Curated annotation (Swiss-Prot):
Keywords: 4Fe-4S, Iron, Iron-sulfur, Metal-binding, Oxidoreductase, Tungsten
Listed InterPro entries: Ald_Fedxn_OxRdtase_dom2, Ald_Fedxn_OxRdtase_dom3, Ald_Fedxn_OxRdtase_N, Ald_Fedxn_OxRdtase_N_sf, OxRdtase_Ald_Fedxn_C, Tungsten_al_ferr_oxy-like_C, W-dependent_AOR
Residues annotated for tungstopterin binding in this entry: 76, 93, 95, 182-183, 185-186, 338, 343, 446, 452, 491, 495, 497
Name of the featured protein: Tungsten-containing aldehyde ferredoxin oxidoreductase
Cofactor(s) in the UniProt record: [4Fe-4S] cluster; tungstopterin
EC number: 1.2.7.5
Gene3D superfamilies (UniProt xref): Aldehyde Ferredoxin Oxidoreductase Protein, subunit A, domain 2 (1.10.569.10), Aldehyde Ferredoxin Oxidoreductase Protein, subunit A, domain 3 (1.10.599.10), Aldehyde ferredoxin oxidoreductase, N-terminal domain (3.60.9.10)
UniProt: [4Fe-4S] cluster binding residues: 288, 291, 295, 496
Stretches assigned to coiled coil: none
Organism taxonomic ancestry: Archaea, Methanobacteriati, Methanobacteriota, Thermococci, Thermococcales
Catalytic activity line of the entry: an aldehyde + 2 oxidized [2Fe-2S]-[ferredoxin] + H2O = a carboxylate + 2 reduced [2Fe-2S]-[ferredoxin] + 3 H(+)
Subunit structure: Homodimer.
Family: Belongs to the AOR/FOR family.
Amino acid sequence: MFGYWGKILRVNLSDGTIKEETFNEEFAKKWLGTRGFGIYFLLKEMDPKIDPFSPENKLIFATGPLTGTSAPTGGRYMVITKSPLTGYIAMANSGGYFGAELKFAGWDAIIVEGKADHPVYIYINDENVEIRDASKVWGKLVSETERMLKEEVGDKHVQIASIGPAGENKVRFAAVMNNGHRAAGRGGVGAVMGSKNLKAIVVRGHKRVEVADKGKFMEVIREKIEKLRKDPVAGGGLPKYGTAVLVNIINEHGLYPTRNFQTGVFKYAYEQSGEAMAAKYLVRNKPCFACPIGCGRVNYLPSIGETEGPEYESTWALGANLGINDLASIIEANHFADEYGMDTISLGGTLATAMELYERGLIKQEDIGGENEPPFRFGNTEVLHYWIHKIAKREGFGDILAEGGYRLAEKFNGLEYFMGVKKQELPAYDPRGAEGHGLGYATNNRGGCHIKQYMISPEILGYPYKMDPHDISDEKVKMVILFQDLTAVIDAAGLCIFTTFGLGADDYTDMLNAALGWDFSTDDYLKIGERIWNAERLFNLKAGLDPLKEDTLPKRFLEEPMPEGPNKGHVVRLKEMLPRYYKLRGWTEDGRIPEEKLKELGLEEFM
């Protein structure tokens, strides 16, 4: 096989066994990689109803066939597990260099199962694998963990995926971190890692990924890189200003969520934009492995020195959504969130929920610990610099916040003020300004998520062509489905979603076929994406998903018209789109997958 080693590493932390398992090309052609591999093993080997923190939960680190190649952005890997935040599938994607190094070590994926009886890390040096004691780094921040483990193994070139104190303390939105500030962020994958007493995976590889036709592959790759460099977003806005280039764009279009999505316009948006960040704090760009885009940023603050980020989502989550406009405070808060290993979207969403509950009188000052605790008021930067530490350590009211926004709102009888889907906090786009994006939120397999069907591309940015953000026709619903299936392919290939700024579906077909020696059509790859999407949906259904109750949006978006800006007066007409989405997916009227659809997709073994 080209693009794969055909090897999976299985590590059982309960009994210490380490096994090599193999797969063939038929398996690869069915599941492709990353989240495809992950959902297969979750469905095959695990009861979807188990407690996410039980030793029986699998924690899977998986690469794609283009991971570790020179394909543009070919350094991605994913962490797949059952989410402690949503209770459904979690598949978190990260860049940096860890994924490529895992591939260089000769492994396509790692399946971690069981639970160690003390803190450990997994050390991988090509085919040599050990479970080692991690007591010395337990409790350490992410940067310190990486430094100490590199010293311990005596190799500064190893790549490390680790958790910080938030993961150790099972904060439900803890992340898996690599290269300091790269995050497999969403769904609480870091909390599952912490529940297994697994502090880190340390990898060193010396192999190179083989492709079917090196000459043809490089010809294709050069063509795709040139397309990306000529694109105004992938070759212009992102390398110049990072993902925070979106701040002004989204705010001008009136869907930049402000004060827990109470409105879509933030009057201080420019002060926290990518342009402002570049002018005041930027030191240099920092691209991930094989990335011609280079959206990563290294910024400098006197209080903390050099740090990476924040990205667009983090800038918003720790800024406008909390009514905070001080960019230095946002950068510092993002830095500590990364060091503790926390998803910034859920962190910000949880704090925003607390702020609205507090301002509406549902959370009292005595609930949070008395007069000495900083009050949860919108615009209060002290909240950032106090509660982030408390959440990561689960101290005081931070222990309640560590459960996430849904459980917080439920505890204080204010669920209508939780802005999330399937218990996961929503990201930085108010769906009242992009209704197809709202349908994507409601139907997303991992809950509140933008990146698995980035409808902001057609509805706001005009990729692959401009669509009216308030059109809810069948064409719009079909586009949501196409984006969901195509994103599954891009993820499974081991590439970054930002390549869709400049590349179309056929471009991914070209790269995959040249690398793998396959003769698949774009429709063949989209069928793999559809299979992955439906398999993840099936896992959720088996885990207890009630579609008609949970494929929905907060009441604010369905019943409260946007109060100001370009989208003033608009709500999301989800009830008009959802039945057509189910029908076009080939599902039942109540959102379930019929037997004939499962058979069509080759999923009958999981029926």
